[in-house]
């Protein structure tokens, strides 16, 4: 016995066994009516139990063989199913006009019979059977990925077919609940998948619109979940006139061993014949020997080479430890391509001028293809970042994470480019009632979330691009504070009351500022909310660009009640240094305010990593309106006798000269006035106030 054959033991069946399964077929003189009632039962969410496979096969036999049982029994479909262990039991009832009449009279079918008695069916069209089967076929291409990806793919195909005028499906079929039911049926029913795939490949005549859709869906299902097979056969095992040659990047000994094992697994897969490209969908034997993890180096190299050739499907994750190998294979393949093209041009060019023209063209072609591929991959990476952020928010929401009653998530703004600010001093008239709630605020957000979810990529999608390194998601979600300042509007001190026109301001801001487009995809992510969250909840990004909202609204309106609110992760959120109201009474400040935040040489180094995760804690006297009734602006005297106009001086982009002079003199590590001016916009309003009050 070859000792190395121990490694192969258990990978091949030595005593093949097929589990027998009985399938009930229904045969009546009113077959179309029976089939329509089966469709109605499925659409209504009724669980047919072990009659489901038989009901689906009855639909297929009616559609493809016009319920001719003899033709079906002699067909390749019936032969394959019998070899797979299926036995057909035909229930005949010539006079039956209802599905109820053909169900066997057995005790365990009594709940099904009761459910079917309440079902009313008025449809009796034969074309509805083909419509239902074509609708089921739309779920095949992404069936192995997951329900979300499969449903989104089906919806895209429905849109295409409707635009082309091929077929229109009933609206209630396109609801999420119904599509999940169909997905579950297709995922569990081997017979339905097999018949659709078989007929989609082999039906060559008698096509109607429904058969055309089925054939199109089956064509898109080929090699679904078998990306490694497709990439290795196309790019690694290169087929030439002289035979099959290995790609130069896999000619080392260790990778050669993986190639040999992979070829053995491919030979086992090829025994399935025309069904081999659908092995993952049909869950055929030997499919578990074709996982990426069994051939890590071969898989990484194959995907890198495929990406270099313009394949945008080669973004599947091959393991963190092999990501660098994939990138190296990508770079090496690009260099090899250029070298081969150069050699070909030298051979076919007749003179130097033609050679230069050809070299320039091929160089441009390679660059264009490479840039287009990277653009598509970047787009997939962005979609994944949005999906990951949404999933993280959903996890927090599901865990019921809530803040304490004395904490509210707030976002204190950075100052943007220089803007002239005028603050009108006038008496404050406190309203006795809370501001009116924003109409349909919560409903509007949920509508946006559901409408934008179609662009997400499922995390389990083998064709979705996963992040190439651990920092990808963090880098894409976190926006530096210098960028966030560019698309902020009129500077305003942080206020505790909420903006009443946030949705209108958001639309104006998005339409007038192009720099903000790159940040929009993060704003569309759903907020983490609980059922009892305040209607006044908004985030600072939506309320920064309102006309006339710089200081007046924050003074006029009382703070909202301290409802329990969720911690919102906002890329421009800053940590509080103080717990006092910026428009409240200015008292003594405890603590060393001038202590550098991040480094001893930088007085106000921006906390880009921690600011997005810290919430502000309100002072106990925050809700006391009497403490806040003051006229603004006013001249304030600091602890050391310096004066400045509050809050006007703190709203300017550049700090007052008195503050700059004091900071330069009093800091332990001397810094220049230029550095301080550069750091001033990165301070939150509270940080500026505390610095000013301690000078």
UniProtKB/Swiss-Prot annotation:
GO BP annotations, alphabetical order: viral budding via host ESCRT complex; viral RNA genome packaging
Source taxon at top rank: Viruses
Post-translational modification note: Phosphorylated.
Disordered as annotated region, ranges: 423-458, 483-515, 527-612
KW Cell membrane (keyword) present: no
Coiled-coil ranges from the UniProt annotation: 316-341, 372-399
Main location group: virion
Keywords assigned: Capsid protein, Coiled coil, Helical capsid protein, Host cytoplasm, Host-virus interaction, Phosphoprotein, Ribonucleoprotein, RNA-binding, Viral budding, Viral budding via the host ESCRT complexes, Viral nucleoprotein, Viral release from host cell, Virion
Keyword Coiled coil: yes
InterPro entries: Ebola_NP
Subcellular localization(s) per the UniProt record: Virion; Host cytoplasm
Pfam families linked to this entry: Ebola_NP
Biased composition (Polar residues): 495-505, 537-552
GO CC term, one of those recorded: host cell cytoplasm
GO MF entry, a single one: RNA binding
Motif PTAP/PSAP motif, residue numbers: 603-606
Known role: Encapsidates the genome, protecting it from nucleases. The encapsidated genomic RNA is termed the nucleocapsid and serves as template for transcription and replication. During replication, encapsidation by NP is coupled to RNA synthesis and all replicative products are resistant to nucleases.
Subunit structure: Homooligomer. Homomultimerizes to form the nucleocapsid. Binds to viral genomic RNA. Interacts with VP35 and VP30 to form the nucleocapsid. Also interacts with VP24 and VP40.
Family indicated by similarity: Belongs to the filoviruses nucleoprotein family.
UniProt free text on domains: This protein can be divided into a hydrophobic N-terminal half, and a hydrophilic and highly acidic C-terminal half.
Name the record gives this protein: Nucleoprotein
Taxonomic source organism: Lake Victoria marburgvirus (strain Popp-67)
């Amino acid at each position: 016995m070859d000792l190395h054959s121990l490694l192969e033991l258990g990978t091949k069946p030595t005593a093949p066994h097929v589990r027998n399964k009985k399938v009930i077929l229904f045969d009546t003189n009113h077959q179309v009516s029976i089939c329509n009632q089966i469709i109605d039962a499925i659409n209504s969410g009724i669980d047919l139990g072990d009659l489901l496979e038989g009901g689906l096969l009855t639909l297929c036999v009616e559609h493809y063989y016009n319920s001719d049982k003899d033709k079906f029994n002699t067909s390749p479909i019936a032969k394959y199913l019998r070899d797979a262990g299926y036995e057909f039991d035909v229930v005949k009832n010539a006079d039956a006009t209802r599905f109820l009449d053909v169900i066997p009279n057995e005790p365990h079918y009594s709940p099904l019979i009761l459910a079917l008695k309440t079902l009313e069916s008025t449809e009796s069209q034969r074309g509805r059977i083909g419509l239902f089967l074509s609708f089921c076929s739309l779920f095949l291409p992404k069936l192995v990925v997951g329900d979300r990806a499969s449903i989104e793919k089906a919806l895209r195909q429905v849109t295409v077919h409707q635009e082309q005028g091929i077929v229109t499906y009933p609206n209630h079929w396109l609801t999420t609940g119904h599509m999940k039911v169909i997905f579950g049926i297709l995922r569990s029913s081997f017979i339905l998948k097999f018949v659709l795939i078989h007929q989609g490949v082999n039906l060559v005549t008698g096509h109607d619109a429904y058969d055309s859709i089925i054939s199109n869906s089956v064509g898109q299902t080929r090699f679904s979940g078998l990306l490694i097979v497709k990439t290795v056969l196309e790019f690694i095992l290169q087929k030439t006139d002289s035979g099959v040659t290995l790609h130069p990047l896999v000619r080392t000994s260790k990778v050669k061993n993986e190639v040999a094992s992979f070829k053995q697994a491919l030979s086992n897969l090829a025994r399935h014949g025309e069904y081999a490209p659908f092995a993952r969908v049909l869950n055929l034997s030997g499919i578990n020997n074709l996982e990426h993890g069994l051939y890590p180096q071969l898989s990484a190299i194959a995907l890198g080479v495929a990406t270099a050739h313009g394949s945008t499907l080669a973004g599947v994750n091959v393991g963190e430890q092999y990501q660098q190998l994939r990138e190296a294979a990508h770079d090496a393949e690009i260099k090899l391509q250029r070298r081969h093209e150069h050699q070909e041009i030298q051979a076919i060019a007749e003179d130097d001028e033609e050679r230069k023209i050809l070299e320039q063209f091929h160089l441009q072609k390679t660059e264009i293809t490479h840039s287009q591929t990277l653009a598509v991959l970047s787009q997939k990476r962005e979609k994944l970042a949005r999906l990951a952020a949404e999933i993280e928010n959903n996890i927090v929401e599901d865990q019921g994470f809530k803040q304490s009653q004395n904490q509210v998530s707030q976002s204190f703004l950075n100052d943007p480019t220089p803007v002239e600010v005028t603050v009108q001093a006038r008496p404050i008239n406190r309203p006795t009632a809370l501001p009116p709630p924003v109409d349909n605020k919560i409903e509007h957000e949920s509508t946006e979330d559901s409408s934008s979810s179609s662009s997400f990529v499922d995390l389990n999608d083998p064709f979705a691009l996963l992040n190439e390194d651990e920092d990808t998601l963090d880098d894409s979600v976190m926006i530096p504070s210098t960028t966030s300042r560019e698309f902020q509007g009129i500077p305003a001190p942080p206020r505790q009351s909420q903006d009443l026109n946030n949705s209108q301001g958001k639309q104006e801001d998005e339409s007038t500022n192009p720099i903000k487009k790159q940040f929009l995809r993060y704003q569309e992510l759903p907020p983490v909310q609980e059922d009892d969250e305040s209607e006044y909840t908004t985030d600072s990004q939506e309320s920064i660009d309102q006309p006339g909202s710089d200081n007046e609204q924050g003074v006029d309106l009382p703070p909202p009640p301290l409802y329990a609110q969720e911690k919102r992760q906002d890329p421009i959120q800053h940590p509080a240094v103080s717990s006092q109201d910026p428009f409240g009474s200015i008292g003594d400040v405890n603590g060393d305010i001038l202590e550098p935040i991040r480094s001893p040489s930088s007085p106000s180094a921006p906390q880009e990593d921690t600011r997005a995760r810290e919430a502000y804690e309100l002072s106990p006297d925050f809700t006391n309106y009497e403490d806040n009734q003051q006229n603004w602006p006013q001249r304030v005297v600091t602890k050391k006798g310096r004066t400045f106009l509050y809050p006007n001086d703190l709203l300017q982009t550049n700090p007052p000269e008195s503050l700059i002079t004091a900071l330069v003199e009093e800091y332990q590590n001397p810094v220049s006035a230029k550095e301080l001016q550069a750091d001033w916009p990165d301070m939150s309003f509270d940080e500026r106030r505390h610095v000013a009050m301690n000078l």
